[in-house]
From Swiss-Prot:
Keywords: ATP-binding, Kinase, Magnesium, Metal-binding, Nucleotide-binding, Thiamine biosynthesis, Transferase. InterPro entries: Hyethyz_kinase, Ribokinase-like. ATP binds at R126, S172. This is Hydroxyethylthiazole kinase. One of its GO terms (molecular function) is ATP binding. Substrate binds at G199. Catalyzes the phosphorylation of the hydroxyl group of 4-methyl-5-beta-hydroxyethylthiazole (THZ). Belongs to the Thz kinase family. Pfam families: HK. It comes from Burkholderia pseudomallei (strain 1710b). GO terms for biological process: thiamine biosynthetic process; thiamine diphosphate biosynthetic process.
Length: 276
């Protein structure tokens, strides 16, 4: 299995393209995650719009450079809003990310909406191990929005899900894995305090969308997003507490320079890590 990091040239090239092109990214998420998601996108040079005002789902779902749907948006928006955006994206050929938050945690009606979204063929599906095992048809109930399974236990499930759905699938944990059902890439590193920052996983989905907007291979885009995220978290590791870490993390995202010389701080050298 190949590993990638910030020192992988394609990762730096992907970030450089976002900074150059400032893609317009439309997102549907909940009020808990919206602020961090927008700030992550702004930090890397993308232009975000988040929310379901007026005709945004239909207009921006089709017109944005990429879309991401975090199903926690159902806290404040109806299922029709999410489905409208996904249908518009699919019809227009807009690439989009599905983040099935808390799938399998015990709400059948909610799970049914997620599966309706899956039928609209997202480009990338991003989640934690419990969510993705459940989406693939396995049994792994999470603890609310948090996982009770390891990424390694999800590998067979995410490979099967990728092959059946046609999407690239990425799972987060101490080591992240990204697969198209044929090739699987590993991204280690990050910082465990990302699990203590509300919306950190949701914001990763937003970052994946920003890199997808460049229209390169979806596997490369998604894995690059994971590597960029891990690197910023590592560089924020000397923050004193959780709140200062969250601020420093966004700072470090904004300071990542694709042209910098190689450092001995790549995603893959610090073993602690991260998120739901």
């Amino acid at each position: 299995m190949e590993s990638i990091s910030w020192n992988t040239p394609s990762v730096r090239d992907a970030l450089a393209a976002v900074k150059r092109d400032a893609p317009f990214i439309y997102g549907l998420t909940n009020y808990v995650a919206a602020n961090l998601s927008a700030n992550v996108l702004l930090a890397v040079g993308a232009a975000p719009a988040i929310g379901a005002a007026a005709d945004w789902p239909a207009r921006f779902g089709a017109g944005a450079n990429a879309l991401w749907i975090n199903t926690a948006a159902l806290m404040s928006s109806g299922a029709d809003t999410l489905l409208t955006a996904a249908r518009a994206a699919s019809k227009a050929g807009t690439r989009w990310v599905l983040d099935p938050v808390a799938l399998g945690a015990g709400a059948p009606e909610y799970d049914a909406i997620v599966r309706d979204l899956l039928a609209l063929r997202p480009t990338v599906i991003r989640g934690n191990a419990s969510e993705l095992i459940a989406l693939a048809g396995g049994t792994a109930a999470g603890k609310g929005v948090d996982t009770t399974a390891s990424p390694e236990s999800a590998l067979a499930f995410i490979g099967d899900l990728a092959r059946r759905s046609g999407a690239v699938v990425s799972v987060s944990g101490p080591t992240d894995y990204v697969t198209d059902g044929v090739a699987t890439l590993a991204v280690a590193g990050g910082d465990a305090r990302l699990t203590r920052v509300t919306g950190a996983g949701c914001a990763l989905g937003a970052l994946i969308a920003a890199l997808l907007a460049q229209r390169g291979a979806a596997l490369a885009a998604a894995s690059a997003a994971h590597a960029i995220y891990a690197t910023a978290a590592e560089r924020a590791a000397d923050a004193r507490g959780t709140a200062s870490f969250a601020v420093r993390f966004v700072d470090e995202l904004s300071l990542l320079d694709p042209a910098e010389s190689s450092r001995d701080r790549s995603a893959g050298q610090i073993g602690a890590k991260r998120r739901e």
